Design a protein with these regions (language model features):
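His/Asp/Glu-enriched, well-ordered alpha-helical/loop segment
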Residues: 77-92, 96, 108-120, 126-204, ...
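Active-site core of metal-dependent hydrolases
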Residues: 2-128
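Short, Lys/Arg- and Gly-enriched loop/turn segments at beta-strand edges
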Residues: 215-221
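Alpha-helical scaffold segments that flank or form the walls of functional sites
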Residues: 1-8, 179-181, 185
Length: 230
């Protein structure tokens, strides 16, 4: 009811939840009926839990491989579910830290690009000098570009620039940019039901980032108006 009330005030596009928790499947059904997309994340769900949630309307996996049940030969968990299922879309942090280079290659080899959504999960301290920082009141430390919680040492988010993630995947997989670029905007827009976004074509919002051959940002356009030039 709380989410329904919030959705009536301002449209909710996506909710991340642990599908193994009591009431989660019923929540997914009601949220989906209200036009809210549901994603599994921060979860210890089994493959059976995943299947129940997907039948109820689950469409995403949140920052794939991170904070979710791992792949095991007797229980494939959410990581295995993401590889096995051909419909579920997965969010992926392409920094070779949250997923190592070999895992990135494995995922992009076994999943269709149409089901991939590159994200950064970046912090406010992204691309700042190494040192202390903050994550919602939790102290973090950034060392060699890797952000970790000071207390536990767990990854606290990334310091990834979006274009660098695209560059990393392109060079690791050899996949053409014309294919990979779908995972940077088009897939996300389609999954969230955002019309007129994610493609350079007549009738679409002219929000564009131009990159050079080394993936450095050259120009940024918002609504067709140049807002940045290197």
């Amino acid at each position: 009811d709380e989410v329904a009330n919030l959705n009536s005030i301002a449209k909710v596009l996506l909710v991340s939840l642990a599908p193994e928790m009591p009431g989660a499947v019923e929540f997914i059904e009601k949220a989906t009926a209200s036009g809210i997309r549901c994603s599994a994340g921060h979860s210890a769900a089994t493959h059976a839990d995943f299947n129940k949630a997907k039948s109820a309307g689950l469409v995403h996996l949140t920052h794939y491989c991170n904070q979710m049940s791992p792949l095991h030969h007797r229980e494939i968990g959410l990581v295995g579910s993401g590889l096995l299922d051909r419909e579920i879309k997965i969010e992926i942090i392409c920094d070779t830290i949250h997923l190592c280079a070999d895992m990135l290659k494995t995922v992009f080899k076994n999943k269709e690009t149409d089901q991939m959504m590159m994200i950064t999960d970046s912090l406010a301290c992204s691309w700042m000098p190494d040192g202390p920082g903050d994550l919602g009141g939790l102290p973090i430390i950034v060392k060699d570009g890797v952000a970790r919680l000071q207390e536990s040492g767990a990854l606290a988010g990334s310091t990834l620039k979006y274009a660098h993630g695209l560059k990393t995947v392109h060079r690791l997989t050899g996949k053409p940019l014309s294919d990979l670029v779908k995972s940077t905007s088009w897939n996300q827009a389609q999954s969230l039901g955002l019309e007129g976004l994610g493609k350079i074509a007549p009738g679409f919002t002219a929000d564009m980032v131009l990159l050079d051959d080394d993936f450095n940002t050259c120009k940024v356009f918002i609504d067709g108006v140049e807002k940045y030039s290197a």
